[in-house]
Amino acid sequence: MRIGALITFLIIVTTACKQNFGEILVINGLTMGTTYSIKIKTNNNANKRNIRNEIEKILSEINQSMSTYIEESELSIINLSKSSDWQSVSDDLFTVINHAKKISVKTEGAFDITIGPLVNLWGFGSDKIENKIPSDEIIKSVKKNTGFQKILLDKTHMKIFKSNPNLYIDLSSIAKGFAVDKIALYLDKKKFKNYLIEIGGEIIAKGENAEKKVWQIGIENPNANNEIIKHTIRLNNMAMATSGNYKNYFKKDDISYSHIIDPATGRPVEHKLASVTVLSHSAMNADALATGFMVLGPEKTLSLANNLKIPIYLIIKNDKYFEEKYNDYFAPFISN
């Protein structure tokens, strides 16, 4: 889930297009069930139509490969297959699944791209079923068909094998970050040195904006008062991703059940972590880590992030207010 309302990430950019040192090409649209916004500092000789077309092509190809909503997507075909054979996959799909497994190991299983059936079971998935509390027996039964360890990869031949044929893979927690990285790679190859890419809250920024200043991201004050912006984050050659939990939940008997499902228990998490923001050189990496950290909770996240030297910013929900915490690796990126 990407954050809105109390915890909003606002891209602070100049709206003036033309300057004597170039202009900002803005490309907006819809992809992967969300919005995207790309700002590129160009010169007057840039083929803007071609840039837009190439970016739209990249997004379309990723969606056609990794969407679970497109019946004939590459991933949907794998999910529907009950084959006991190894299946060939595209380079992009292999890259994303391979990285997802690495993050699963790094987060001790907290990040898991196979828990879609559990998310659906609790009424938070694409099936749109009624929110209800499943029995222990049903949770145990569904959990048998989950587990990132059941995805085997052949790096030599770019193939995937599901040791459980009922395994269902959902890349929504990592694919947007991958798309951000791939567009950034395209812009780098085209020698663009200044841009900002955002897809569904996943961001990567490089160089300067139209005012010759480093791109800045404003973090809204979670405790609503006259101070709208709590911090301004300076991003250059860095990616940022945020995942959160406070808004998407249901209540039964005065107990709140979060949409964040712990793969280990098959149940919603019960900690007070409302959101986590991760900085990384890769948007795909930040995207997946943010999701995994939301499962771990504040204490384990701070400990693991410090051990791995990952910059993180946490919002923790207390009884009457939101508390912020960030580690020493995140502090240098705060400009106010």
Which residues are covered by each model-predicted region?
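Mature catalytic core of soluble alpha/beta enzymes
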Residues: 2-9, 14-336
